[in-house]
C-alpha cells in the first residue's frame, strides 16, 4: 500500500509538472490590477501591466507653437516640452512663409515707389518751355502764312535764318498756326449753321436795327449776334499776338528754346 501510494503521488507530481511545462508564459503572469478590463495578450500595456498614459498637447508641440494656438506663454511659466519632428517642420514652414511674405510685400512697395518716381519724371519731361517770339518775328511769320500754309525745307531754312530762329521753332509755329486756323474755320461754320436756323423775319429785324444804328452814328449798342467777336479774326489781324494763343489745343506742339 505504501509503495502504491508513493507511486500515485509521484505520478501526480509528474503530471502537474508536465501541465506547468505545457502552460505558456502568459498563463504565469499575475492578474491585472483592474479585473473589469479584459485581457488582451497582444497588448504591451496588458503584458507589462502598466496603466495607459495620455499624452498632452505639450508633449507634441513646442511652447512657441502652443502660444500661437492657446495664447498662453509656456516658456514664461517655466514649462518646457519636447518638440516633435512634425511641430518642428510646422514651425520652420511658418517662419519660411512669413519671410517670403515680408519679402514680397517689400518688393511690391519698392516697385510702387519706382513707378511713382518714373511717372513724376515722365510728367516733368512732358512740360516744355514756350518760345517767346518778338512782335517782328510774329509779323513776318503771319505775313508768310497768308500765302503759304506749308513750308518747304528751303523756305523753312530761309525764314529761320532771316528771323534768327531754329528750324524746330519755325515748324512749331506753322503747325500751331494751322491748328488755330482750323479751329477758326470750324467756329465760322458753326456760326453759319446757327444763322441758317434763325427765321427770315428775325434776320430782317436784325438788319433793320443795324441800319438804324448806322444812321444814328453807331451810338447804340451792338447786337451780340453781329458783334465782331462772334466771328473769327483774319490771319492778318493776329499780328502782335504771343505764341501762347497759338498753343491752346493738344494737337499743337511745343519745343525748347
Swiss-Prot record:
<dbReference type="GO" id="GO:0048920">
    <property type="term" value="P:posterior lateral line neuromast primordium migration"/>
</dbReference>
<dbReference type="GO" id="GO:0048922">
    <property type="term" value="P:posterior lateral line neuromast deposition"/>
</dbReference>
<comment type="function">
    <text>Transcription factor required in several developmental processes. Involved in axis formation during embryonic development by inhibiting tle3a/gro2 from binding to tcf7l1a, thereby facilitating ctnnb1-mediated transcription of canonical Wnt/CTNNB1 signaling target genes. Regulates convergent extension movements and hypaxial myogenesis during gastrulation by activating non-canonical Wnt signaling via wnt5b. Required for the formation of myofibrils and fusion of fast muscle precursor cells, potentially via transcriptional regulation of genes specific to thick and thin myofilaments.</text>
</comment>
<feature type="region of interest" description="Disordered">
    <location>
        <begin position="1"/>
        <end position="43"/>
    </location>
</feature>
<dbReference type="GO" id="GO:1904105">
    <property type="term" value="P:positive regulation of convergent extension involved in gastrulation"/>
</dbReference>
<protein>
    <recommendedName>
        <fullName>Transcription factor LBX2</fullName>
    </recommendedName>
</protein>
<keyword id="KW-0217">Developmental protein</keyword>
<dbReference type="InterPro" id="IPR017970">
    <property type="entry name" value="Homeobox_CS"/>
</dbReference>
<dbReference type="InterPro" id="IPR009057">
    <property type="entry name" value="Homeodomain-like_sf"/>
</dbReference>
<dbReference type="InterPro" id="IPR001356">
    <property type="entry name" value="HD"/>
</dbReference>
<dbReference type="GO" id="GO:0042692">
    <property type="term" value="P:muscle cell differentiation"/>
</dbReference>
<comment type="subunit">
    <text>Interacts (via N-terminus) with tle3a/gro2 (via C-terminus).</text>
</comment>
<feature type="compositionally biased region" description="Acidic residues">
    <location>
        <begin position="245"/>
        <end position="257"/>
    </location>
</feature>
<feature type="compositionally biased region" description="Polar residues">
    <location>
        <begin position="233"/>
        <end position="243"/>
    </location>
</feature>
<dbReference type="InterPro" id="IPR000047">
    <property type="entry name" value="HTH_motif"/>
</dbReference>
<dbReference type="GO" id="GO:0006357">
    <property type="term" value="P:regulation of transcription by RNA polymerase II"/>
</dbReference>
<keyword id="KW-0539">Nucleus</keyword>
<dbReference type="GO" id="GO:0000578">
    <property type="term" value="P:embryonic axis specification"/>
</dbReference>
<dbReference type="GO" id="GO:1990837">
    <property type="term" value="F:sequence-specific double-stranded DNA binding"/>
</dbReference>
<feature type="region of interest" description="Disordered">
    <location>
        <begin position="206"/>
        <end position="257"/>
    </location>
</feature>
<feature type="region of interest" description="Required for convergent extension movement and hypaxial myogenesis during gastrulation. Required for the formation of thick and thin myofilaments. Required for myod1 expression in the pectoral fin bud. Required for continuous expression of cxcl12a in the posterior lateral mesoderm at the tail bud stage and in adaxial cells at the 10-somite stage">
    <location>
        <begin position="1"/>
        <end position="46"/>
    </location>
</feature>
<dbReference type="GO" id="GO:2000052">
    <property type="term" value="P:positive regulation of non-canonical Wnt signaling pathway"/>
</dbReference>
<dbReference type="GO" id="GO:0055001">
    <property type="term" value="P:muscle cell development"/>
</dbReference>
<keyword id="KW-0238">DNA-binding</keyword>
<dbReference type="GO" id="GO:0005634">
    <property type="term" value="C:nucleus"/>
</dbReference>
<keyword id="KW-0371">Homeobox</keyword>
<dbReference type="GO" id="GO:0000981">
    <property type="term" value="F:DNA-binding transcription factor activity, RNA polymerase II-specific"/>
</dbReference>
<feature type="DNA-binding region" description="Homeobox">
    <location>
        <begin position="126"/>
        <end position="185"/>
    </location>
</feature>
<dbReference type="Pfam" id="PF00046">
    <property type="entry name" value="Homeodomain"/>
</dbReference>
<dbReference type="GO" id="GO:0060828">
    <property type="term" value="P:regulation of canonical Wnt signaling pathway"/>
</dbReference>
<dbReference type="InterPro" id="IPR051892">
    <property type="entry name" value="LBX_TF"/>
</dbReference>
Amino acid at each position: 500500500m505504501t509503495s502504491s501510494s508513493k507511486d500515485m503521488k509521484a505520478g501526480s507530481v509528474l503530471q502537474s509538472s508536465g501541465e506547468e511545462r505545457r502552460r505558456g508564459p502568459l498563463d504565469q503572469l499575475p492578474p491585472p490590477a483592474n479585473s473589469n478590463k479584459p485581457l488582451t495578450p497582444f497588448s504591451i500595456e496588458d503584458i507589462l501591466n502598466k496603466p495607459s498614459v495620455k499624452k498632452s498637447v505639450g508633449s507634441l508641440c513646442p511652447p512657441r507653437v502652443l502660444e500661437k494656438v492657446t495664447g498662453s506663454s509656456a516658456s514664461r511659466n517655466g514649462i518646457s516640452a519636447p518638440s516633435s519632428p512634425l511641430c518642428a517642420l510646422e514651425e520652420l514652414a511658418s517662419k519660411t512663409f512669413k519671410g517670403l511674405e515680408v519679402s514680397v510685400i517689400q518688393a511690391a512697395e519698392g516697385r510702387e515707389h519706382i513707378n511713382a518716381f518714373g511717372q513724376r519724371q515722365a510728367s516733368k519731361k512732358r512740360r516744355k518751355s514756350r518760345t517767346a517770339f518778338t512782335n517782328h518775328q510774329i509779323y513776318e511769320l503771319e505775313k508768310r502764312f497768308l500765302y503759304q500754309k506749308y513750308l518747304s525745307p528751303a523756305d523753312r531754312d530761309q525764314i529761320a535764318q532771316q528771323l534768327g530762329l531754329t528750324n524746330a521753332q519755325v515748324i512749331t509755329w506753322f503747325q500751331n498756326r494751322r491748328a488755330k486756323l482750323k479751329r477758326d474755320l470750324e467756329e465760322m461754320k458753326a456760326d453759319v449753321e446757327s444763322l441758317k436756323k434763325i427765321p427770315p423775319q428775325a434776320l430782317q429785324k436784325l438788319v433793320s436795327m443795324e441800319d438804324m444804328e448806322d444812321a444814328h452814328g453807331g451810338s447804340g449798342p451792338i447786337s451780340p449776334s453781329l458783334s465782331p467777336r462772334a466771328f473769327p479774326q483774319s490771319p492778318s489781324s493776329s499780328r502782335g499776338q504771343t505764341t501762347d494763343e497759338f498753343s491752346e489745343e493738344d494737337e499743337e506742339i511745343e519745343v525748347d528754346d
